């Protein structure tokens, strides 16, 4: 799970910081930087893959130079920094089945990507700083804040075990010497050294595959588990073919939905009933989800039975129903762990049923007060006041965080010049408070009450609609 992030130098982020909960809701109008945060999380996840930086950056929206914070038409940041704090599982295994119990489950990973030009003017990206360090148990209050004091001492020990001795670094950088060091787990472990002077074109973390570097491997696996759902109706509707086998894990576009459901049914027959019940609550008219092993056509197929006992193939279900079905299946999939990012989950949903899909997303998150709860996390972004209004149902639940994204003016000093930048800020919503709230530590960051947040979103929504109407009139 990601518990906090710091970003500097990426797109609209300058000295940006925010915290995450098991369920995090980010609301804001278009252009406020909501999608940029998802882009940052996606980039971090891809940086853990064993690929060169230029390939990873080329997958982002915009050119490589546009990904660095722009100061003016001709000036931009020369580096970008990401720092994430994580909660990882206590036990991990590598690709060869070797297992290890971690000393630390709370870890902080920092990566700095810098740019320079080669002799013919091409942009070169390289890793200029990388580190992985434990977060000390003393003073780490994230678990307590996310469980509102409901955590027993034994449960706290499960999530954040006591460790005797001085914390060690698992990846470290000495900038003056230009050396990144990867430290093997264990006392007096061997060291592998990589030299930044040779312009490392991929992260050290991406090359970790062995349990010998267990804490680094745990962070790599955590980043690789982050999924950004962009469910495609075409992929959701397709049966899973034996002959063109692509696995039984649901992809970000919804492929393998049928094979995943069949696997779940085979391991737990009750799960299919739970999925049917969830879907019937969300979509009126359906009462049962069926998955079949079609041996004649060598494929797994999903059907849905209506309340009048008519069987419908997944090929004829609406896009909205298919998206909801995919989430229902994920809820009952014990192989689903990690971060799930979802943009505008309210799309295609009857406004009167938004509370049901929010309940569904909440069920997709970890309950840290329950022993052995899988580390599941959901981050959504939305511009819907209805989604934010639904948060009142969880006003006393500290496992949920709500933020309002907006753009703020920042004066930045660089090379004896002052630049006026529009940067993304996240303003926390206090679900239990009344009136206006302001963060005393940062004068330019505002904390909202729920009513403030709703008024802000509704006002901006109206302003956007009026601007659209005026533009339409101007084109006549």
Regions found by a protein language model. Name each.
Residues 1-50, 271-274, 278, 285-453:
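Switch/communication elements of ASCE P-loop NTPase nucleotide-binding domains
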Residues 9, 84-92, 134-136, 304-308:
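Short acidic, glycine-rich loop/turn motifs
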Residues 39-108, 112-121:
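Conserved P-loop NTP-binding catalytic core
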Residues 80, 107, 224-225, 397-400:
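Short glycine-/polar-rich loops that comprise or flank the Walker A/P-loop
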Residues 80-82, 227, 298-300:
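Short beta-strand micro-motifs in enzyme catalytic cores
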Residues 89-91, 233-238, 410-412:
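Short, acidic Gly/Pro/Ser/Thr-rich loop/turn segments
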Residues 95-273:
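Electropositive, glycine-dotted interaction segments
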Residues 438-476:
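C-terminal alpha-helical "lid" subdomain
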